[in-house]
From Swiss-Prot:
Record's protein name: Large ribosomal subunit protein uL3
Organism: Mesomycoplasma hyopneumoniae (strain J / ATCC 25934 / NCTC 10110) (Mycoplasma hyopneumoniae)
Taxonomic placement: Bacteria, Bacillati, Mycoplasmatota, Mycoplasmoidales, Metamycoplasmataceae
Pfam families referenced in this protein's UniProt entry, alphabetically: Ribosomal_L3
Assigned keywords, A-Z: Ribonucleoprotein, Ribosomal protein, RNA-binding, rRNA-binding
One GO CC term, this protein: cytosolic large ribosomal subunit
Amino acid sequence: MKGILGKKVGMSQLFTTEGIAIPVSIIEVPENIVTKIITKEKNSYDAIQLAAFDKKQSRFLKPEIGHFAKANTKPKRFIKEFRDFQGYKLGQTVDVSIFSPGEFVDVTGTSKGKGFAGTIKRYNQAIGPRSHGGGGGSKPIRQTGSLGDISGNKVVKGMTMPGRLGHEKVTKQSLEIIKVDKENNLLVLKGSVPGPKKSFLVIKSAIKKPNPKNPVSLFVPNSDKEVKNE
């Protein structure tokens, strides 16, 4: 399974040669450094640890300085393990060229935090009756309904109640790669990805792989030629 670390730049749109607009997410994918090799002999599973985005020197910690020195690099801000991703040695780099247009990937990030919210917005619960005893104002009709059986004498775990909305780990599956820009270290995906701008993302090969597609032919202004995404 291939994987790489990136940062969300934002969203835009591209046009095909047929004039169809495609909403796309642009992800910055710098060179990832292999900072650790994990093997079955020592850890009972195979994986590599990738790191990206330099830390400020004022935030270096002594243990991580030694850890990253083994890979001949400086401490990084974003570190993740990728299982069953082999063929690399300690200190090698992994770049965006491991992917190609037409492939599908899963993108994991932290969704936007929206603060405190009630159950209607947070869990899509129904609003109560506005008449026949529903009460006046907005509060009574927007309250949570039943919290469980009366014989339980307690509120069981997992009940849908008001609380913080968003800021959760979210994975969007099977996003199509529209373009790979190795010169600028950018990956262009069809659709949206979790999180705000500048948030860190984990990009992996899709688990649920749709039928393969031919790369989209993009329209280029002031040109009579169509561009295959290479």
